[in-house]
């Protein structure tokens, strides 16, 4: 009787190892791609672009020369349109970039002829230049207002200890007080002082000449915390208290807050002898709606 089985004869060697032909067949046999993988496969050949390139930037349509997009080699646009990367097209055959195109025209104008945007669009175009990594445009925008002035302002704020932390504290305190009181606005006290050294009372100018020599141990007698919510200072720079107040209002307003402030007096903390604190205290009013 002949017994027929459904298995092919085992070609493996007695020691359990596969023959060289079996190993080669297993190694060379490619995996069969699924329909999903085949549908998302990208072209293997370099993508070719026409001399005049139609663009769709987030729904905004532009047309420019290929040489314009490749003007600066170390930019994202030059890399995208180098042929090394695949760029999808829309239904009309325009090359699509998934980015808001509101200010892409200013980017193109710089690439075409070196034109710069007006002041009111400098900040927005700067963000686009960062995204597309256009170094020459970034350099020129940084030398324009308001970015040039912002660099000077940040240099001053860099001397201010914990400026950002204290700014966030102002917002958080104002929010909590408004929520707790179910109020439209909240008020808080802020102390802003440039110098650590306390001064004598205003009504006794003669006492200004009576300052005594202080030792290091005496310094503790002058250290105290004014009864306020947040304090800023001291700092070493030409910029004064009013400059810092301007920075506070600017940065709070940039968060969409309505800010009012006024000086409501000074800290009258008595320290030692004829020395009082006299740091100015400001009331900040944060309106939420």
Swiss-Prot record:
Designated gene of the protein: KCTD7
Protein's cellular compartments: Cell membrane; Cytoplasm, Cytosol
Leader sequence segment: none
Xref: InterPro entries: BTB/POZ_dom (IPR000210), SKP1/BTB/POZ_sf (IPR011333), T1-type_BTB (IPR003131)
Name under which the protein is recorded: BTB/POZ domain-containing protein KCTD7
Biological role: May be involved in the control of excitability of cortical neurons.
GO cellular component assignments: cytosol; plasma membrane
Region (Disordered): 1-40
Subunit architecture: Interacts with CUL3.
Cited Pfam families: BTB_2
A GO biological-process term: membrane hyperpolarization
Keywords associated with the record: Cell membrane, Cytoplasm, Membrane
Parts of the chain that traverse the membrane: none
């Amino acid at each position: 009787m002949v017994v027929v089985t459904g298995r092919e004869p085992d070609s493996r060697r007695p020691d359990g190892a596969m023959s060289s032909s079996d190993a080669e067949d297993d190694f060379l046999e490619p995996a069969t791609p699924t329909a999903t993988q085949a549908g998302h496969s990208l072209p293997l050949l370099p993508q070719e672009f026409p001399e005049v390139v139609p663009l769709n930037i987030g729904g905004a349509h532009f047309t420019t020369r290929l040489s314009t997009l490749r003007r600066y080699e170390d930019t994202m646009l030059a890399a995208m349109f180098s042929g090394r990367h695949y760029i999808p097209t829309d239904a009309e055959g325009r090359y699509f970039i998934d980015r808001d195109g509101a200010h892409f025209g200013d980017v193109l104008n710089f690439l075409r002829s070196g034109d710069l945007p007006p002041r009111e669009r400098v900040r927005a175009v700067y963000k686009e230049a960062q995204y597309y990594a256009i170094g020459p445009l970034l350099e020129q925008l940084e030398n324009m207002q308001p970015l040039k002035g912002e660099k000077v302002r940040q240099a001053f704020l860099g001397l201010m200890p914990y400026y950002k932390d204290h700014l966030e504290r102002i917002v958080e305190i104002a929010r909590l007080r408004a929520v707790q009181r179910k109020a439209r606005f909240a008020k808080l006290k802020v102390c802003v002082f440039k110098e650590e050294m306390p001064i004598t009372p205003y009504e006794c100018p003669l006492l200004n000449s009576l300052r005594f020599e202080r030792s290091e141990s005496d310094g503790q007698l002058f250290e105290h915390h004014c009864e306020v919510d947040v304090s800023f200072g001291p700092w070493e720079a030409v910029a004064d208290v009013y400059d810092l107040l301007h920075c506070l209002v600017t940065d709070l307003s940039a968060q969409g807050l309505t800010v009012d402030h006024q000086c409501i007096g000074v800290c009258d903390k008595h320290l030692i002898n004829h020395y009082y604190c006299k740091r100015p205290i400001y009331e900040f009013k944060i309106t939420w709606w």
